Design a protein with these regions (language model features):
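Hydrophobic adenine-recognition pocket in adenosine-nucleotide-binding enzymes
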Residues: 32, 116, 150
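Conserved acetyl-CoA-binding loop-helix of GNAT-fold acetyltransferases
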Residues: 116, 122-136, 159-163
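Terminal substrate-recognition subdomain of acyl/acetyltransferases
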Residues: 2-23, 181-196
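Acetyl-CoA-dependent GNAT
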Residues: 48, 60-119, 130, 192-194
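Helix-loop element at the rim of GNAT/NAT acetyltransferase active sites that forms part
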Residues: 42-59
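Conserved catalytic-core motifs of GNAT/GCN5-like acyltransferases
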Residues: 145-150, 162-182
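Conserved GNAT acetyl-CoA-binding A-motif
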Residues: 130, 137-149
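A short beta-loop-alpha structural element at the N-terminal edge
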Residues: 28-40
């Protein structure tokens, strides 16, 4: 079970929690703070290089440490947004974010993004990060629906998302143009976090 705060205390929405991965390694899941900006940038840059399933390329990813601090601060201040990081021995190994919509008519929605270093994949970290974010969203007073976008050919990720309760709602054909000039479909998935 992940621990979170229904009401933020000094921008903290989520209490740190230790989790055990399938290989027995203990990791800490906690809310990101501005001091994490440099480490988070390094981690994101590393997993962007190792993944063929991200829309943003490493050449396009060029925020400064100040930009990253502002992004972290914005997510922490927005009551329907969350940014969690996974750490091992104080090194960031993955992250998940819920980017909550800010407009009145759409703020019940958040878009989920997740990334994990290559050497930490396939040992349960993605499921743990997703469960913590989903549990937090279920208790959030504003959020009703989580959305995500995924390459339609990223079957491993799609399997995890379905396991976590997401359902396919749309396919954008040929939405992604790959480096080799081939096309990939974008799959839109949704999870309702409020039961009426």
């Amino acid at each position: 079970m992940c621990q979170f705060l229904a009401v933020a205390l000094k921008d903290m929405k989520f209490l740190p929690v230790e989790k055990i991965l399938k290989n027995g390694t203990v990791v800490t899941i906690r809310q990101a703070i501005k001091k994490d900006a440099e480490g988070l940038l390094q981690t994101v840059s590393r997993y962007m290089i190792d993944s063929d399933h991200l829309v943003t390329s490493i050449e396009e990813f060029n925020p400064t440490i100040l930009d990253e601090k502002r992004w972290i601060e914005a997510l922490n201040e927005n009551r329907n947004s969350l940014l969690l990081i996974a750490t091992h021995k104080k090194k960031i190994i993955g992250n998940i974010n819920l980017n909550g919509e800010t407009r009145k008519k759409t703020r019940h929605n958040a878009v989920l993004g997740i990334g994990i270093l290559k050497e930490w994949r396939s040992i349960g970290l993605g499921e743990i990060l997703m469960q913590c974010a989903i549990d937090w969203a279920k208790e959030n007073l504003t959020l009703e629906t989580l959305w995500l976008h995924v390459f339609a050919t990223h079957f491993k990720a799609i399997g995890l998302y379905k396991k976590m309760g997401f359902e396919e709602v749309a396919v954008q054909q040929d939405f992604i143009k790959n480096d080799d000039n081939s096309y990939s479909d974008n799959l839109v998935m949704k999870l309702s976090v409020k039961t009426n």
